[in-house]
Amino acid sequence: MKKFCNVILIILYIIIAERNNLDNKRNYIKLILGLKLKQLRQERHLSLNELAERSSLSVSYLNEIEKGKKYPKAEKIAQLAQALGVKYDALISLKLTKNLTPIAELLDSNILEMLPLDHYGIDLNKFISLMSDASYQLSALVATVIELARSSEMSQNNFSRTALRIYKEINDNYFEEIEQSVIKFIEEFKLDPAPPLSYNSLTSILIKKYNYIIDEIRFNDFDELKELRGILKPGKRPILFLNPHLSGAQKIFIIGKELAYNYLKITNRSNVHSSLKLNTFDHLLNNYISAYFSTALLLNRDLFINDINNFFAQEKWDEKFIINIIKKYDATPEMFFQRLANLSGKVWGLNKYLFLRFNTISGTDRFDLTKEVRLNINQNPGGYQASGYYCRRWISIEILKKIKEELNGIDSRGKMKVGVVHSKFHETEDEYISFAVAQQNILDKNSFTSVALGFYLDDQLKSKIKFWNDLKIPFKIVNITCDICDLSDCKERASEPITLRKIQRSLNIENAIKKL
């Protein structure tokens, strides 16, 4: 019976997927017809009114067709073909003229689906209409973008995540409306904001107010789900399945996210609590909003600001301050740094920073950048993801290497490795004070994660962080990746400067040509 149900679910999934593909195809056909109609009309120097008279169709209807919103019936297409002096088959053909071919390829690819145009106030049909009026040069540019996307295997996942990162940076990674929603939530449900917030009090709201069932047992029945943190099964009584192996901080964080989805009335969301299942921009954005809400709920704004003020007021660097604050709120290191990043510009004027999260696995020397926010700075770590040879002098990578060596297969998932560095980017005047925390991942003892926040060193930082020049803080020259770095005495180098040598060779050739 169980296998039969699974087969039915798979069939339903295929039907839904095919229906979505069919809808996309229909939209594509409508847009192509609109482009062709507009081009043919303009080639014949006809206004919409003139074409309306010739075809006996209304101006408004023709306008809807050209915008890709309507697809006329066969007899109306025949009227249009006769009015334009073209064959019926030529008008309905999906083949476009040479200058419009790149637009057809753009529509036929999944690139436009990756771009969250609606979130930036851009209407897809208007965008296509503008492109149809473009010059041959712009058409060539579109074709180039498509080729670049194909050659670099640009994925929807990368596109959406890049769009989200830019969205956060545009808003300075701070959202007052979410902050106010959290304050209202605390008042409405009469919660005590003093840390740590009670797990039972928050789950009680989910159960009583939103009719949830919380299940921490069923996960053990499926070994395939061990890497996931939680799954929501929607229904009249939603069931939240939580991975029982999560830490208390991780569980309450998920509870906070579920409260956010319900309280903020967010419906377009992923039901799986895992970054592996966040591919569309809407899911990514709403996941970020719910995570922001949960973090702001668990790390109370006023109390957290007071704790950070005390931390920044210290004359000497002391890693215990960070550990104590994390433990006080029963938070994860990422929640701590995320909250600090959200508030740093608004509260302390520290609005120039790098936020980085790296993952690594035992037995490898690979470090993957899995989350990044860069605010008002020149450095671009994520722009070099292809090589993976990030500078091994970064504090986030340095402490990952140390914790891997220290544990060496030992299960010590609560242990935190804290680091700090005063760094200067090679051949620039850009300096940073960076803090980082690394931990063994709670669901896999062979996997490790570090989170780092690096503030740009300027007069504002010097006025706020009193221990910035503590001699105990090591100073290091760093770079982006080994591929573009010409430091000759770097003991941490993981790769030869291959890219830099190619660039230098090209420059040498150019200089030689100029001397001829």
Task: Specify the residue positions occupied by each region the protein language model found.
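Short, intrinsically disordered or compositionally biased N-terminal tails of bacterial proteins
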Residues: 1-24
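Short juxta-domain linker segments that transition from a proline/glycine-rich
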Residues: 10, 25-32, 39, 43, ...
